[in-house]
């Protein structure tokens, strides 16, 4: 009898502890929705609440701590620590924790997890009916059995309302588009998101009339994606109204569509730039920052970068360099090339992360990063590296790349001197509007460096340099 009583008391105690742990976890989620912690004390308070909840075996808290360790959010970035928290939550049958372990293993983020272990965790998450895990698993099955993958995705939407699964069915070119569209038509009769997707499908086929019809139905029922597609349709219509399109983006954002929040913010920043009064400028910019903050917290990487810029330069908000750099770091960690480049420029040249960030941005096609990498390679006397980056930039028609190559071949930096090629490169740079090249070509044609002397051509380039306020050219009479 007493044993039964003790067991009942233990169950009640465990239930109370679990309820308290859940309350701590929910409090953290509410704080996160309000924005990034402003001070170290606020950040530590959020971490402490999660740790307390995790210690009481509340799996979602353990999983969130693991995610923060992966991102370096309030905690030191540490994959081993993240794995420990994920494993703790996985033992408590938390589907998301299994999925996070699968991600780490499949992406080779840690030697602690083999591919086989990653797949096992993915299957565990699928068995726990985690919608995102089913989505990932279905994508893995595409090569082996596309029909089975399609059915998994379709069922994942019909049973779990996993919107990305249905969206993938529309976007993946390997599925029969007619079959997918017929399925959408059936679902759309009673489903506003399917209606929105059908509109998007028609939009990608340039059938604006059909896209308008279904997007209008979806937006009338306040479907966020439907409002977004309705905005896209309005932008593409022959007599589309930009103001109306912005209203649909704002409506989509209000209903939780993150991409719309970002796009609406971009439009507002443009409006702020062109505003005729300071009051309107502040009004547009402030609303833009609110939308960017919402999208950034939700993980939208371009929004994180844009928010960083607003905070760094005090646009629509008080200037806050620390927060700005923090958002810049988050965007850079998620491979945003502009963020990687700007973060590298903020770091001293000797900093261990300066060159890797610069290199990563250049690899993604960031033209300024390419030029900086070429200069770095020149300083290292690495002709092959310097030429590689300049030629990559030249392929993208970057004027400065032609100019720097012209300098290299004129001065014999890392390459043999070739005055004729140098003159041709300066000419190409000038054709692309490079002001310094106008002045270089003036000297080239004046003195006959790699070309025949030509006073008329020299005078033409000197005039172009002067028209573009080239300092040295301004004082020359020719």
Question: Where in the sequence are the language-model features?
Answer:
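Short helix-capping/linker turns of helical repeat alpha-solenoids
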Residues: 17-20, 34-35, 56-58, 71-73, ...
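Alpha-helical segment of the N-proximal tetratricopeptide repeat
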Residues: 22-41, 52, 56, 200-201
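TPR alpha-solenoid repeat register
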Residues: 23, 61, 97, 133, ...
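Hydrophobic face of amphipathic alpha-helices that form TPR/SEL1-like repeat modules
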Residues: 27-34, 64-71, 101-108, 136-143, ...
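Residue-level detector of the short coil/turn that links helix A to helix B
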Residues: 73, 77, 113, 144-145, ...
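TPR/TPR-like (Sel1-like) alpha-helical repeat modules
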Residues: 154-159, 453-470
């Amino acid at each position: 009898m007493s044993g039964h009583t003790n067991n009942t008391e233990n169950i009640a105690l465990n239930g109370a502890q679990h309820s308290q742990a859940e309350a701590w976890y929910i409090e953290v989620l509410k704080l996160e929705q309000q924005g990034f912690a402003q001070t170290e004390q606020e950040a530590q308070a959020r971490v402490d609440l999660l740790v307390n909840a995790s210690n009481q075996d509340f799996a979602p808290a353990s999983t969130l701590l693991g995610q923060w360790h992966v991102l370096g959010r309030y905690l030191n970035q540490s994959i081993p620590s993240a794995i420990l928290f994920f494993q703790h939550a996985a033992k408590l049958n938390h589907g998301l924790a299994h999925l996070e372990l699968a991600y780490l293993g499949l992406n080779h983020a840690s030697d602690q997890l083999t591919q086989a272990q990653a797949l096992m965790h993915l299957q565990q998450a699928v068995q726990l009916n985690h919608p995102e895990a089913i989505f990932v698993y279905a994508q893995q099955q595409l090569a082996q059995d596309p029909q089975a993958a399609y059915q998994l995705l379709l069922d994942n939407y019909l049973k779990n309302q996993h919107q990305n699964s249905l969206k993938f069915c529309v976007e993946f070119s390997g599925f029969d588009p007619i079959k997918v569209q017929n399925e959408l038509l059936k679902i759309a009769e009673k489903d506003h998101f399917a209606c929105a997707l059908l509109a998007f499908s028609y939009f990608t086929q340039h059938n604006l009339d059909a896209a308008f019809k279904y997007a209008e139905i979806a937006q009338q029922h306040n479907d966020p994606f439907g409002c977004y597609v309705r905005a896209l349709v309005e932008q593409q219509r022959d007599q589309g109204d930009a103001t109306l399109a912005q209203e649909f983006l704002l409506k989509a954002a209000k209903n939780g569509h993150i991409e719309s929040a970002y796009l609406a913010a971009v439009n507002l920043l443009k409006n702020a730039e062109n505003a005729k009064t300071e009051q309107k400028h502040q009004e547009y910019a402030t609303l833009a920052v609110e939308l960017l903050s919402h999208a950034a917290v939700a993980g939208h990487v371009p929004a994180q970068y844009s928010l960083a810029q607003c905070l760094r330069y005090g646009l629509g908000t008080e200037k806050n360099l620390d927060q700005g750099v923090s958002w810049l770091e988050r965007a850079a960690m998620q491979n945003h090339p502009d963020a990687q480049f700007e973060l590298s420029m903020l770091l001293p040249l000797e900093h261990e992360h300066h060159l890797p960030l610069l290199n990563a941005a250049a690899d993604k096609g960031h033209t300024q990063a390419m030029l900086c990498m070429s200069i770095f390679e020149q300083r290292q006397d690495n002709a092959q590296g310097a030429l590689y980056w300049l030629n990559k930039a030249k392929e993208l028609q970057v004027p400065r790349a032609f100019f720097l190559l012209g300098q290299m071949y004129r001065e014999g930096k890392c390459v043999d001197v070739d005055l004729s090629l140098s003159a041709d490169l300066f000419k190409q740079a000038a054709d692309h509007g490079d002001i310094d090249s106008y002045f270089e070509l003036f000297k080239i044609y004046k003195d006959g460096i790699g070309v025949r002397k030509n006073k008329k051509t020299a005078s033409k380039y000197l005039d172009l340099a002067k028209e573009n306020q080239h300092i040295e050219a301004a004082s020359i009479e020719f």
